[in-house]
């Protein structure tokens, strides 16, 4: 019965349904990005016939929503939260502060002047 078991994902962070959904969105976007870029180029190329551009527009709109880059949301690698994320460290503000105070983040220390 192990063939029906879900595949193990090596996300390396806290896992809940939202994190799993975000992971699948990132995979779908990565696979479909070259096709989306090609279709967008065809749509914006005014030297091509209008019918070709319209067909490309239709194909682009029929692609799955998860292939859009706006569907991807930055999430904390420690807690899975999606708000208050520091982009450079991929952590929420609170987790960043706690890790910085404990000295777990190299090159970061509390400011004093």
From Swiss-Prot:
The keyword Nucleotide-binding does not apply. GO terms for cellular component: mitochondrial small ribosomal subunit. InterPro entries: Ribosomal_uS14 (IPR001209). It is found in: Mitochondrion. GO terms for molecular function: structural constituent of ribosome. GO terms for biological process: translation. Keywords: Mitochondrion, Ribonucleoprotein, Ribosomal protein. Pfam families: Ribosomal_S14. The keyword Ribonucleoprotein applies. Component of the mitochondrial small ribosomal subunit (mt-SSU). Mature N.crassa 74S mitochondrial ribosomes consist of a small (37S) and a large (54S) subunit. The 37S small subunit contains a 16S ribosomal RNA (16S mt-rRNA) and 32 different proteins. The 54S large subunit contains a 23S rRNA (23S mt-rRNA) and 42 different proteins. Belongs to the universal ribosomal protein uS14 family. Component of the mitochondrial ribosome (mitoribosome), a dedicated translation machinery responsible for the synthesis of mitochondrial genome-encoded proteins, including at least some of the essential transmembrane subunits of the mitochondrial respiratory chain. The mitoribosomes are attached to the mitochondrial inner membrane and translation products are cotranslationally integrated into the membrane. This is Small ribosomal subunit protein uS14m. It comes from Neurospora crassa (strain ATCC 24698 / 74-OR23-1A / CBS 708.71 / DSM 1257 / FGSC 987).
């Amino acid at each position: 019965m192990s063939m029906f078991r879900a595949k193990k994902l090596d996300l390396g962070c806290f896992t809940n349904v939202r994190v799993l959904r975000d992971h699948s969105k990132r995979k779908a976007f990565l696979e479909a990005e070259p096709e989306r870029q090609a279709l967008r180029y065809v749509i914006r190329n005014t030297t091509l016939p209008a019918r070709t551009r319209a067909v490309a527009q239709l194909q682009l709109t029929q692609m799955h929503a998860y292939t859009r880059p706006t569907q991807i949301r930055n999430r904390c690698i420690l807690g899975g939260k999606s708000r208050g994320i520091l982009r450079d460290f991929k952590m929420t503000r609170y987790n960043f502060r706690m890790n910085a105070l404990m000295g777990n983040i190299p090159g970061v220390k509390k400011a004093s002047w």
